[in-house]
Amino acid sequence: GRTTVFDDPLRPGRRGSELLPIILETHKPEDLIILMLGTNDCKTFYGATAGSIGLGIRKLVRQIRDGAPSAKILLMSPIALGEKVWDGFDPEFGKNSVQVSKELPEIYRQIAEEEGLYYLAASDYAVPSERDQEHMDEDGHKALAEAVLAKISEIL
């Protein structure tokens, strides 16, 4: 998965702040950009707080404004991690990762308000699957897709 601003020591080329300018340049013109990153920033080896992840999101918002100044921005906070994501599912996460992931919606909401962005909390519509405690199941994807469609219709 991708991160906001962190280099993944196990998977090179995953830092959003490195990839985003290229994506913006190759996808012009942009009417609406949906930004939803942060789950992978919760991995234990980054030691990130929700606030520091928020700083990464702010950097990405600045990059979007620089690369696509006329685009509207929908900031989405990701779903929270499951309570036992580290226990037999994904050892890159720990107990603190779950707590940090639960703090992201409020941080992202504040950023959206301060930056004049549209906002949607994925955790209002979906939860992590029992299968891996990290990703949505089919019902979660469907519920979130319907919410995103409604939000896009409202924005555009």
Regions found by a protein language model. Give the residues of each.
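Conserved SGNH/GDSL esterase-like catalytic core that processes O-acyl groups on lipids
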Residues: 1-63, 69, 84, 99-103, ...
